[in-house]
Amino acid sequence: MSLMTPLLIRDVLKALPHRYPFVLVDRVFSTENGEVHALKNVTINEPFFMGHFPTEPVMPGVLITEALAQASMFCLHGQMEPGQIGYLAGIEGARFKRKVIPGDQLHLHAKLEFLRRGLGKTTCRAEVDGEVAAEMQILFAVAKG
């Protein structure tokens, strides 16, 4: 599937099973040939900033990972049956290279490496201002929700 116009938040909500406060994709700019470019706008209003860390707010690495996992599901657009959900099955080679703070725009890039028999893998990268914030491979299982 190739995306000609960006998916706005209402379209993202139709595609993902997640809801507030766990929707970590705000927009999908492109999907083509198993590759996705999506966006998470990071604001001070995120609930996790109250505790991580009150005097120096930093987006937790596990939530950057979750944002990449959610973006990865758009690599499968058109390949999943209605009612199927992608479940996180593993993470390989995760590296966190810079802090993500309020005001950052987190660009999420995912490339589908394979999808066979309900198991898949994406290579992912999160960037802020063109600088890599995190990179990893995400393994997932697709099953009925």
Curated annotation (Swiss-Prot):
Molecular function GO terms recorded: (3R)-hydroxyacyl-[acyl-carrier-protein] dehydratase activity
SUPFAM superfamilies: Thioesterase/thiol ester dehydrase-isomerase
UniProt-annotated catalytic positions: 52
Protein's name in the database: 3-hydroxyacyl-[acyl-carrier-protein] dehydratase FabZ
Reaction(s) this enzyme catalyzes, per UniProt: a (3R)-hydroxyacyl-[ACP] = a (2E)-enoyl-[ACP] + H2O
Annotated function: Involved in unsaturated fatty acids biosynthesis. Catalyzes the dehydration of short chain beta-hydroxyacyl-ACPs and long chain saturated and unsaturated beta-hydroxyacyl-ACPs.
InterPro entries cross-referenced by the UniProt entry: FabA_FabZ, FabZ, HotDog_dom_sf
Main location: cytoplasm
Gene source species: Deinococcus radiodurans (strain ATCC 13939 / DSM 20539 / JCM 16871 / CCUG 27074 / LMG 4051 / NBRC 15346 / NCIMB 9279 / VKM B-1422 / R1)
Gene name tied to this protein: fabZ
A Pfam family it matches: FabA
One Gene Ontology cellular component: cytoplasm
HAMAP family: FabZ (MF_00406)
Broad class of enzyme this protein falls into: lyase
Family membership: Belongs to the thioester dehydratase family. FabZ subfamily.
Annotated EC: 4.2.1.59
The entry's keywords: Cytoplasm, Lipid A biosynthesis, Lipid biosynthesis, Lipid metabolism, Lyase
A GO biological process held by the record: fatty acid biosynthetic process
Subcellular location: Cytoplasm
Keyword Hydrolase: no
